[in-house]
Amino acid sequence: MSTTLRLAFLWVPTIACFAIGCTLSPTQVPARAKHERNGHTADDALVQFSLLAALAADDYAGGAPLRDLLAAGDFGVGTFDRLDGEMIVLDGTIYQALADGTVRAADLDGTTPFAAVTFFGEDGRIENLTAATLDDLDAQLDRKLPHRNLPYAMRISGEFAAVTLRSVPAQSPPFEPLVEVVKHQVTWQHHNVRGTLVGLRCPDWMGTINVSGYHWHFLSDDHTIGGHVLGCEFQNGSLRYDECTSVVIHLPQSTEFDEFDASEVTDEDIDQIERQRAQTSPK
């Protein structure tokens, strides 16, 4: 068996696109490598806009148009201009979970400083999944997902006995680093709510490109509850996953991006920002 790695920079007038493609033999990934979308065939790519390290370093303003995001995928997570809420992309709609606890369909004329999406096509499923905590869920998936070093898009549907969520209010310049912003996050606990966990798992090699490990957002079935997940508890959930066999990164061409220093963003900062967990299972 052989694995090939493709690296390329593709320059267009407003965006630099860094593509990393990992092509595996069919015996390694038996599921289909491409999915049909609107009569077209789309690669199983995780398409990312900017870098987590840039976001952590306070590059919050402007970014890619949300319409461009939907052209790249129908499923994923991210944030909005000036960190104005948590982004959930599900079934081709972008939802904005605001710091006042409301959820709305996002204005597609808006922008995102950071997001990652894919065209979700099921490559496998895990039924009757039960988790007492978010850490319990992550540990189970580490054992059950087929490949350690591929990114995964995952959706878990069911009734959640409890879910702890957060969002942050829109920021104003001069921007603070994200590790300071999350100290002022707003959190909620909800009980006995039906909905979907929308998540990504990125392998360790992705480092400051994205969150290594698991990154979960949540949206209730009635689209009234949503946010970044700090904790959850559920029984008999249905998980579907999509293996992403390539990664495409659209890099901003802004002064803020050009000047940020990735070495100043520590793993401890990323833990505080994106791997934060509720201290106990929600009750």
Language-model regions: role of each:
Residues 2-12:
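Bacterial N-terminal signal peptides that target proteins for export
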Residues 52-113:
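N-terminal low-complexity or amphipathic/hydrophobic leaders
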Residues 92-142:
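Hydrophobic alpha-helical segments and helix pairs
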Residues 135-200, 207-209:
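Long, positively charged binding patches that form subdomain-scale interaction surfaces
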Residues 211-219:
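Histidine-centered divalent-metal-coordination microenvironment in nucleic-acid enzymes
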Residues 220-263:
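A hydrophobic, small-residue-rich beta->alpha segment in the mid-to-C-terminal subdomain
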Residues 262-280:
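Conserved catalytic alpha/beta cores of large enzymes that bind or transform nucleotide phosphates
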